[in-house]
Amino acid sequence: HYRQGDTLSLTCERADYDGMMQMMHARKNVVLRHRRQKLLTDSLDFDRLYNMANFFDGGTLIDGKDKLVSDWGEYHTETREAKFVFNVKLRSGKDVITTDTLYYDVPTSTAHLVGPSRIISGASVVNTHDGYYDTKTDKAKLFGRSTLVDKDKSITGDSLYYVKNGESTGYGNVVYVDKKN
């Protein structure tokens, strides 16, 4: 069991610590708790010099109603920013975001989606290549020619402002399709 101050603790079945490099290698059933967040994995390296936790054999970060899963990631305990790469899935309530790369800011609960990404929220499906999704407000700013499909309607634009259960707005080369009317 490793404890740093009153905000960080790390438990695992096996750990090696390199005092010279100030690096902890934690293996098997690793649980890193930092404030209200919990990071679960089987392989984690914690760099005490840079306050950086890296997982590389799959991991899950739980932050309130948000649950992030990916093959590889890092969590910076000082800035409380995280990066998730490869097979990323963010569940926020009933909403699901899938992408290849996601940056998550813990204090604001904002996800930055990089590369081909999909947001599924009830009957709505959003496809984008670049965007920011606020999991507290369920609002998104999307770039890179994004598309929102909701039942019989779709909107595509160079950028979109998406509000769950509200109005969405497109900007630049907008195409709106209403299959019902």
How would you describe each model-predicted region?
Residues H1-N181:
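Structural signature for solvent-exposed beta-strand/loop edge elements and short helix-capping sites
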